Amino acid sequence: MTLIEQIITIGICIVAVQFTRLLPFFVFPVNRPIPQYIRYLGKVLPPAMFGMLVVYCYKNIEILTGYHGIPDLLAGIVVLGLHFWKKNMFLSIAVGTLFYMALVQLIFI
């Protein structure tokens, strides 16, 4: 790609990102209530995404080889414990990820 094409591509990306960030403010203005189905989606999608992350993380574990998925299961237990204790999805995922990385980098080498 030439320099001009790269600049145009970056410009298009910037416009697309800003459009998607500003779109909700135009679709759901402050003076109108948010539709009930949008509130419903805001309530059910975070746990659904959490469930999809769990399935994605555990799909390739091979119980009969290597470490038998022990680091994965321990990290999952940490995530569940933190989530039930603190009720903070970001904290649960971040600490679970750090715990898993520490296990596979330092203990299960």
Curated annotation (Swiss-Prot):
The keyword Transmembrane applies. This is Uncharacterized protein HI_1737. Keywords: Cell membrane, Membrane, Transmembrane, Transmembrane helix. It is found in: Cell membrane. It is a multi-pass membrane protein. Belongs to the AzlD/HI_1737/HP1330 family. The chain crosses the membrane at residues 7-27, 37-57, 63-83. It comes from Haemophilus influenzae (strain ATCC 51907 / DSM 11121 / KW20 / Rd). GO terms for cellular component: plasma membrane. Pfam families: AzlD.
